[in-house]
Curated annotation (Swiss-Prot):
Protein's organism: Caenorhabditis elegans
Motif position, Nuclear localization signal: 12-18
Tissues expressed in: Detected in the head mesodermal cell. In the tail region, detected in the stomatointestinal and anal depressor muscle cells.
The protein's role, per its UniProt record: Plays a role in electron transport. Utilizes the bis-histidyl hexacoordinated complex with iron to transfer electrons to cytochrome c and molecular oxygen. Plays a regulatory role in the periodicity of the defecation cycle under oxidative stress conditions. Not involved in imparting protection against general conditions of oxidative stress. May participate in redox reactions under anaerobic conditions.
Boundaries of every Globin domain copy: 26-166
Alphabetical list of PROSITE patterns matching this protein: GLOBIN
Protein name in UniProt: Globin-like protein 26
InterPro entries for the chain: Globin, Globin-like_OT, Globin-like_sf, Globin/Proto, Mb-like_M
Gene Ontology annotations of biological process type: oxygen transport; response to hypoxia
């Protein structure tokens, strides 16, 4: 397997119309307010319920995800998803914190590529499941700006998770190549 010494560059932040938000912000203040309200509504339904809805949707979109999420760890993952989303909501004013969190999680999951067959597109399935769950939990309250804000945030989160995952694969590949050279 060929090895490169460079690490992939982080994904660029999405371009938004000028004047809508501060330079380094993912969402403008109105969008943050909408997303926070949606999250409050979702988390009132019970955190594990929200997490299990997301997990169930992911597995429905890609059945092989169920192979990675052992039945014995489903409850754990349901709670982890909710805790992750809670941290994202708490950090909406600090996009660098969101990036770091997502990249760390993505990188930690790289080890599952070889052992369980995890693929990078599973992060997309997670994003789709989160977006659908937000739509469901908002019910009749849905309006365009709310969906747009959720989509922008989820896209950013997924891009950062994918970047961390790719970086983790790169680090693993470098380690494996080094180990092969030493043998």
């Amino acid at each position: 397997m060929g090895s490169s010494t460079s690490t992939p560059a982080p994904p660029p932040k999405k371009n938004k119309p000028e004047g809508r938000k501060a330079d380094n912000q993912i969402l403008n203040s109105y969008q943050k307010s909408i997303v926070r309200n949606a999250w409050r509504h979702m988390s009132q339904k019970g955190p594990s319920n929200c997490g299990s809805t997301i997990t169930r949707r992911m597995m429905a979109r890609k059945s092989t995800i169920g192979d990675i999420l052992d039945r014995s760890t489903l409850d754990y993952h349901n709670l982890q998803i909710v805790e992750f989303l809670q941290k994202v909501m708490q950090s909406l004013d600090e996009p660098d914190k969101i990036s770091k969190l997502c990249q760390e999680i993505g990188q930690k999951h790289a080890k599952y590529r070889r052992s369980k067959g995890m693929k990078i597109d599973y992060w997309d399935k997670l994003g789709e499941a989160i977006t659908e769950t937000i739509r469901e939990y908002q019910g009749w309250k849905i309006h365009r700006e709310s969906l747009r804000a959720a989509t922008v945030l989820v896209s950013y989160v997924v891009d950062q998770l994918r970047f961390g995952y790719s970086r983790g694969l790169h680090v693993q590949g470098s380690r494996e190549t080094k180990e092969d050279d030493e043998e």
